Amino acid sequence: MAATMTVEEVRKAQRAEGPATVLAIGTATPANCVYQADYPDYYFKITKSDHMADLKEKFKRMCDKSQIRKRYMHLTEEILQDNPNMCAYMAPSLDARQDIVVVEVPKLGKAAAQKAIKEWGQPRSKITHLVFCTTSGVDMPGADYQLTKMLGLRPSVKRLMMYQQGCFAGGTVLRLAKDLAENNRGARVLVVCSEITAVTFRGPHEFDSLVGQALFGDGAAAVIVGADPDESVERPLFQLVSASQTILPDSEGAIDGHLREVGLTFHLLKDVPGLISKNIERALEDAFKPLGIDDWNSVFWIAHPGGPAILDMVEAKVNLNKERMRATRHVLSEYGNMSSACVLFIMDEMRKRSAEDGHTTTGEGMDWGVLFGFGPGLTVETVVLHSVPVTA
């Protein structure tokens, strides 16, 4: 009789040898594009709020300072005209919003996933795990199930559905994908973040900060993560070296979201940028001390662009050169704040720009990098990345 394996031998056989690696990235947006310069007039007109002249001026100033050039939104003028309750400030409208997002969130996620799978170049039957993240709507079975059906993934694919996480979750999904890939030899994890603002859009009110209406946009991003890539058929982009999550001290209530009959309402304290910048150096030190790195300009940066004030204050706090946030600011400008999807858009922009600009690595010529997610809690996700050489 053959000797049975020990638990230790089983565990060793189950685990990958090397670090989790991003093997492909895909992004998608709705077709409807709105330009920030035109948005205040459009927003106050469609919500029948032109009589609020002072509030409109305030909103115009916010849009002017947002550093956003354009955003993409599933909600068109026609959809909003057909759903007047979504244009009111606090009218019951959850059913209408849900009816939109439970269909459109998986659909937009599918578009991003198809691009990632095409770049990866392997049969989708090799996908072993699916992580789906959205802050837009809730259903059972969830968007993970819908996407599995849409893409024709194996029924045995291991799914994880993340609802209502918010803007830090682009870091969360990478942390989870890293653990899944490294603890399951041969695993290939499809990660999808799909966000549609149909749950948060509402008319203006003097009691509302209007920050969300000025910043949020729609988008979906997908990555494929696996360890021990077969470099004859797979092309690594970034290695996921470490990942952590923390709740910032004295930050309770700084960002809250509440799903109610009126949709998803957001409440933000003015000091969110200050709270993040005050704690950013500690997060960097905790992540990079084991690597002997303490020059924050020597690493590439992918930071969730919650808004321009956050980026400005983080830059000032750690004396960052302006070019470190170039990819981050580009995505903010061209897409707005797409919640969890943003950092994956920035990762995509960085590897493309690195190749176009003739850099030697996917991280703007640098070896080490950091990815930050900021969101409700205040919660901060910190992911340490290692770039790979740029290949033609």
From Swiss-Prot:
InterPro entries with a match to the protein in the record: Chalcone/stilbene_synt_C, Chalcone/stilbene_synt_N, Chalcone/stilbene_synthase_AS, Polyketide_synthase_type-III, Thiolase-like
EC number: 2.3.1.74
UniProt entry tagged with the keyword Transferase: yes
Residues at the active site: C167
Keywords: Acyltransferase, Flavonoid biosynthesis, Transferase
Superkingdom of origin: Eukaryota
Pfam (any one): Chal_sti_synt_C
Catalytic activity: (E)-4-coumaroyl-CoA + 3 malonyl-CoA + 3 H(+) = 2',4,4',6'-tetrahydroxychalcone + 3 CO2 + 4 CoA
Pathway(s) served: Secondary metabolite biosynthesis; flavonoid biosynthesis
A GO molecular function held by the record: naringenin-chalcone synthase activity
Enzyme type, top EC level: transferase
Known role: The primary product of this enzyme is 4,2',4',6'-tetrahydroxychalcone (also termed naringenin-chalcone or chalcone) which can under specific conditions spontaneously isomerize into naringenin.
Protein family: Belongs to the thiolase-like superfamily. Chalcone/stilbene synthases family.
Descriptive protein name: Chalcone synthase 1
Provenance organism: Secale cereale (Rye)
Gene: CHS1
